[in-house]
Every structure is written in structure tokens, then in C-alpha cells.
Design a protein with these regions (language model features):
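An amphipathic, basic-hydrophobic helix/alpha-beta surface used to engage anionic
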Residues: 1-211, 251-255, 269
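Exposed, interaction-prone extracellular/peripheral surfaces
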Residues: 132, 136-324
Length: 324
């Protein structure tokens, strides 16, 4: 809403008010709604508001408002631009994803021991809040009585379920979909209070160390709100460099829209270092994989690297689909 207050009720025949929009808004359908002609007369307070339904993600600044008036015959016109900077951040879109399926997938897969059968014979190393799907035998009754909340034993295997997410910032017409899917995965993982680190390397290098909780989520979403497709180095180089710094068990997730030889090399880097690896390839719709991409998928699957092609607006059960 734009409000103009006048000290003196001088009669105005008309008033043209235009809110100058950021350049990113040029393609918005509602762009003409930022300009209005009013007939204020003697009113001291003049207001108008408009709504932009679709705003691109990013940091946007509304810098100024242009006001114009004149007489009935057009012999006199007066135009003034007021500087009223206002900056706000638009977070990326996201979709609710059932992250629990990721743990089930690795527990059933060939890349790790079957935790379901091993937990009973494993020494617990701590306690945590109960989660749906936890066994009755895992409940720590002493901790439950002490905290008045149902507490579950935490095992060493569970602590090894750290996630390391890489976003491919290579220029692509599907980059916005890559950002949306990445934001969805990050949110799903951290909302389950699972530790996650995030690596985003383009013209600038942004790395969020292993952590969990809402603060980590907000920081990563803030970065994804402003991230650009400006990759300078191959993703495989970033993966290899970052994995050299990590010694604890970690599951690597790569998000891309183009399953290139470099992405294959990045997945191989993770596998060589005995890291579990999942590759998500974002496409607009089905049957858009090239012959090269299909060949790379077959090669990676032979190396027990999990690959899943995901499509726009169909992200909800991506982990469940991989585990089939």
C-alpha cells in the first residue's frame, strides 16, 4: 500500500501515482497495476494498493514512487519522485517430501547393513524424541519418565545418517525447478531434525557445515532465494574437494537437471570414498532423458549409485520411488 499525506488540503484535480518496480518484475502480469490515476480533491490522506500474485524468488528492492499532477488544461504539470527504499526477500518454492523414505531405502538397500535387525544388538549412544515408525523396544523408559515425553534410544547407525546436499548451478532452462526441488529436499531433511550440510558453488562459494534445526533451514533457504546458475567449476571438483574434508559417514545427494559426464564423475567420487550417493535428475516431464543420460543412469546403477528422475510438481514421493 502507498499512502501520501498532505499538510494542507490544496485542491488537486488529479494525481498520477506510480510505484517504480524492480527490473526483475518486468515480466510479471500485474505490472500495469503499479500505476493509478486518482482524483483526490481536498483529501489530505491519499492511498492506493495493488497486488502482485507471482513474484520471482530473490531479493527485491522497491526504490521510489513517482507522483504527477497538473491543471485541467494541461498548461501546468508537476512531477516529483520520492525515494522510499523497501527491500524484501522471496524464498524459493518448495513441495512437501516424505523424507522418512530415505532412511528406509538405505536400510533395505545393498549399500548398508540392515539397521532394523542390527539396532537390537547395538549399544545405544543417546536418546531423542520419538518419531513415527520407531519400534516399541527402542523406547527409553527412564528418559521418558524424566522428560515427560516419549524418548527413543539413538543408535550409532542413526547418527551416521548425515546428509550432504550439492546443487548443480550449471546454466539450464530448468534451473528454477532445480532450486525448487533442492529447497524441498533441504526442508524435508531438516524438518526431521536430521543433520545436513549444503554445498553451493558458483561465482561465489557457499557451504553450510553439518547442522540441523530451523536456523540451518532458514539460512539455506535464504541462500537458495538468491542463488544463480553461474557455475564456474565442474561439480565433480567441488564434490571431491568437500568430501576430502569429511571423515564421518555421510550420504551424498546431488541435484541436477542435466546428467552429464561431470555429474557421473561427481557420483563416482562419492562412491570411491565409500559414501552412499543419490542423484536426482530434474526434468519438466517424462521421456526427456537423452540417450547419453540413459546410458549414464545404467552405468551408475551398476555401481550401486541410486539415480532417480523427478518431474515438476511430482516431488512428494521421490524417496519412496527410489526404494521400489
Amino acid at each position: 500500500m502507498i499512502t501520501i499525506k498532505r499538510k494542507f488540503p490544496f485542491p488537486l484535480l488529479y494525481l498520477v501515482i506510480e510505484d517504480e518496480l524492480p527490473p526483475q518484475f518486468i515480466s510479471c502480469k500485474q505490472i500495469k497495476m503499479n500505476k493509478v490515476v486518482l482524483f483526490p480533491g481536498l483529501k489530505r490522506n491519499i492511498s492506493f494498493q495493488y497486488v502482485i500474485d507471482t513474484i520471482p524468488r530473490g531479493e527485491h528492492t522497491f526504490s521510489s514512487v513517482r507522483v504527477k499532477t497538473g491543471d485541467l488544461f494541461g498548461m501546468m504539470e508537476k512531477e516529483v519522485t520520492f525515494s522510499v527504499p523497501n527491500t524484501f526477500l522471496v524464498y524459493p518454492q518448495y513441495v512437501d517430501i516424505a523424507y522418512q523414505q530415505l532412511e528406509n531405502h538405505f536400510e533395505q538397500g545393498v549399500l548398508s547393513a540392515n539397521i532394523n535387525s542390527a539396532k537390537d544388538s547395538t549399544i545405544s549412544v543417546g536418546v531423542r524424541d520419538y518419531k513415527p515408525g520407531d519400534r516399541f523396544s527402542w523406547i527409553d523408559w527412564k528418559a521418558t519418565a524424566r522428560t515427560n515425553n516419549i524418548m527413543t534410544k539413538e543408535f550409532e547407525q542413526q547418527r551416521s545418517h548425515n546428509i550432504m546436499i550439492f546443487i548443480d548451478r550449471t546454466e539450464s532452462p530448468l534451473f528454477e525447478s532445480v532450486v525448487t526441488f533442492t529447497a524441498s529436499i533441504v526442508r524435508a531433511v531438516l524438518k526431521q531434525n536430521s543433520p545436513a550440510s549444503f554445498v553451493s558453488i558458483g561465482k561465489e562459494q557457499t557451504i553450510f557445515p553439518l547442522d540441523n534445526g530451523d536456523t540451518q533451514l532458514q539460512q539455506i533457504l535464504c541462500h537458495l532465494a538468491k542463488v544463480q546458475a553461474d557455475s564456474v567449476f565442474p561439480l565433480s571438483q567441488s564434490v571431491d574437494m568437500e568430501l576430502r574434508k569429511i571423515y564421518e559417514p555421510v550420504t551424498v545427494i546431488l541435484v541436477t537437471s542435466n546428467l552429464s559426464p561431470d555429474i557421473q564423475k561427481a557420483a563416482d567420487c562419492a562412491a570411491i570414498r565409500n559414501r552412499k550417493c543419490m542423484v536426482f535428475v530434474v526434468k519438466e516431464k517424462a521421456n526427456q532423458l537423452s540417450h547419453r543420460e540413459i546410458s549414464i543412469i545404467e552405468t551408475l546403477k551398476k555401481r550401486q549409485i541410486f539415480v532417480n528422475t523427478v518431474y515438476e510438481n511430482r516431488y512428494t514421493n521421490v524417496f519412496f520411488e527410489v526404494s521400489k
